[in-house]
Amino acid sequence: MKKIIKKMFTVLIIIALVIGIALGVYILTGLDNSLTLREYSFKTDKVTNPIKIAFVSDHHGSEFGENNSELMDMINASDPDVVLLGGDMFDEPEFVDIEKDLISQLTEKYDVYGVLGNHAYKMDEYTADDLRKIYAELGVTLLTEDCKVLMLNGEKINICGMDVYPENEGFDGRIDKTLADTDKDAYTVMLYHRPDKWEEFKGKGIDLMLSGHTHGGQWIVPGVFNGILAPNQGFFPKYAGGLYEFDDGMNLIVSRGLATKNTIVPRVYNPPELVVIKIESDR
């Protein structure tokens, strides 16, 4: 009897070790923070020639290669017609120079438009107005309740954006004001940092909404849940990252962002990503 118990105990130890090793390998594999390219494609009758957008969000002063060379190489290889910034590019003061350098590289080569995220209202040494000045000096057009009708690859497109406002401020009239000067026949892209507010934008004639903020829910268990925790959504967020389609024809892309620094919870099976969007004709 003692021999049987000893054998069973040994088997249980071996099983526990195998499970522990497998779990360790699984977690370590998931901690790979290599930069990822995430591509989306949409068909519309509002364009004839294709338009390509690079969407950069939640960078938080992170580094991908020296002077962010890996990120810049990926953007350049995608050959975008325009670069859009989804907010929370800047973070702690020690990362500001890193961010300035990246944005300078972008504006040297591309037209760059963006919005502020929630961290613009949380930084100790910089106010939102300070960041607006920095963006302007670097050549970024910030969209604050504003739309620009751009000509990209021979096609008109509305690029619109709104800041994230402090929690006690709402949306009353702001979205309609923002969209007032759009070309109603052109494809419309709306930049807004928080995806959980998508219902505010529904039914407004927006074709594509671009958001960030969630950092992909930090942890992903492939095939089980798409993120464990996101700000303003709590545990198991519905809009953690990816593409969401709504019945009014609006699509929402939530970037999982690029942040690898200053994160309390590590990213697991949730690599930082550059989003590239292609808008093509269905005619």
Residue spans of the language-model regions?
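Binuclear metal-dependent hydrolase catalytic cores centered on His/Asp/Glu-rich metal-binding motifs
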Residues: 129-140, 147, 152-191, 198-199, ...
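Beta-strand-turn-beta hairpins that frame and shape the catalytic cleft
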Residues: 41-54, 140, 147-160, 183-185, ...
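Short, Asp-centered acidic motifs that coordinate Mg2+ and/or phosphate
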Residues: 81-82, 113, 140-141, 157, ...
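N-terminal membrane-anchoring alpha-helices
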Residues: 1-47
